[in-house]
Structures are given as structure tokens and as C-alpha cells.
């Protein structure tokens, strides 16, 4: 497997719709306001994806138990805003602005941006498997004892694209993966 460079990512986004919408280069200034942004868009060997304006923040209002086999949404409060405050030692879900279509011979890894990591915010996104498509559900943990702010429409994580030496026998689409073509924030289900 080899990591793919900016030229390949650009070509796949522009001719195959691999990333929509696609920012061809790093965007770190808001064109309308001149405000500095946490960067997003095409980089040398990856693509920095953005958070949408929709968030789900864990809360324990109903004294719930988090069980991935029997998950209920009463563990969350839903927020739609340009920012989201994650309580101390808590967790939020969000989704990407970008819609991804992964080629059959590609696997991605997604790594949190250092700007957030240096503030104690850890981003977890599982790999995008061959022929998976959808909006990315993003998990964000606030590991600090303080409330933490995250920003919609700004960078949150970098996607790295790895091309396989050989084609896989069965793709995510062919095995009918449960998160195929997910829209919005998709909570766990078995």
C-alpha cells in the first residue's frame, strides 16, 4: 500500500466525485470576514475535512448507560450552531461537511488535527473502507477538566488515502456495510 499525493486526490475528487465539496488547497482564512480558520482542504498527502453545524453531545440527564448493542439517543443533546461546547471529560459526535466516495482499491485513515490535539481534544474516526460512501461521523473527546470549543465549517481531521497493491475480494458496498451512504450524524447500531 502506498499513500496518495495531492495530485491524485485532486484528480479523484474532480473527475470521480471522491470528495464533495472539494477545497483545492489549504483554506485558513475566511474569505468573507478575514478571520483565521482551523485549516481545511487539500494538503500534500491528505485532505483536511470540516465539521458541519450539527452536533450531538453526551449528557447524563436520564442517568443512561451507553451500550453499543442497545444504543438510545437519550444520552445526547442535539445542537445546531457554528460552535459546540463539549463539557469537561465528555464527548461529542458530529459529521463532515464533505461527502466521500472511496474507490475499491483504496483505504483511508483519519487523524485528528494537531491544533485540537494540543488543546486536549482527541478525534477518532474509523477507516473509510473500499467502496464506502457517505458523510463521515466524527467522534470528539474532551480529555480536559475544562469545557472545550469546536468550530463548524473548519478543519477537524486529516484523511490519508492508501492505494492497495491488489483489489480486495469484497468491498464495503458489496457486503452491505451498515454505515453505507450515511447521512448526518449516524449513531451506533448492531
UniProtKB/Swiss-Prot annotation:
One of its GO terms (biological process) is dUTP biosynthetic process. Keywords: Hydrolase, Nucleotide metabolism, Nucleotide-binding. Homotrimer. This is dCTP deaminase. HAMAP family: dCTP_deaminase. The keyword Transmembrane helix does not apply. Belongs to the dCTP deaminase family. Pathway: Pyrimidine metabolism; dUMP biosynthesis; dUMP from dCTP (dUTP route): step 1/2. Catalyzes the deamination of dCTP to dUTP. PANTHER family: DCTP DEAMINASE (PTHR42680:SF3).
